[in-house]
């Protein structure tokens, strides 16, 4: 598999060879869906909480007498049937949302995503990407000159200037190869990988 190699200005200079075992796999939609759903589920904090009728603080006084009013009988205002009452089946923070995906499947899912991105022309390799100062304007102008408005940049190491310059750009994410997740790879329109980061990805997914 040949990937497009860009220079510092974002212009195509040549191609770089990439292993077919990572960037030449077939598109496996079911596996990608499983990996993405598992990643999102495992990222949940699981702290949602609702109160049942025992936990809602209401008076235990009977709202009205049992018979003779013409209204439906009622015991207390914390009943789940009432507005402001407790939930019948409340959510509790001890719920487990985690999905298990073994390492082999997770890596295969990442390879399938990277292969599809390469086929669609959304993935490119760049010599390096840096800015002279931690200024959002500098990085924004640089990416705009490359025609990139939504991009995930995978670098071999986090450059402080680049990281600080990207924090205020909503459609730009800078990360290392070990932090490249399936959700981000699918979400961003373009993926830029530095040459050194490409070697790390090959080593990680080999």
From Swiss-Prot:
GO annotation, cellular component aspect: ribonucleoprotein complex; ribosome
UniProt keyword annotation of rRNA-binding present: yes
Regions of compositional bias (Basic and acidic residues) in chain numbering: 49-58
One family name in Pfam for this protein: Ribosomal_L4
Keywords of this entry: Ribonucleoprotein, Ribosomal protein, RNA-binding, rRNA-binding
UniProt xrefs under InterPro entries: Ribosomal_uL4, Ribosomal_uL4-like, Ribosomal_uL4_dom_sf
Entry keyword Ribosomal protein: yes
GO biological process, alphabetically ordered: translation
Entry superkingdom: Bacteria
Biased amino acid composition, Basic residues: 59-70
Gene Ontology terms, MF aspect: rRNA binding; structural constituent of ribosome
Region (Disordered) location: 43-78
SUPFAM superfamilies: Ribosomal protein L4 (SSF52166)
Function: One of the primary rRNA binding proteins, this protein initially binds near the 5'-end of the 23S rRNA. It is important during the early stages of 50S assembly. It makes multiple contacts with different domains of the 23S rRNA in the assembled 50S subunit and ribosome.
Known partners and oligomeric status: Part of the 50S ribosomal subunit.
UniProt xrefs under HAMAP family: Ribosomal_uL4_B
Family assignment from sequence similarity: Belongs to the universal ribosomal protein uL4 family.
Protein name in UniProt: Large ribosomal subunit protein uL4
The organism of origin for this protein: Herminiimonas arsenicoxydans
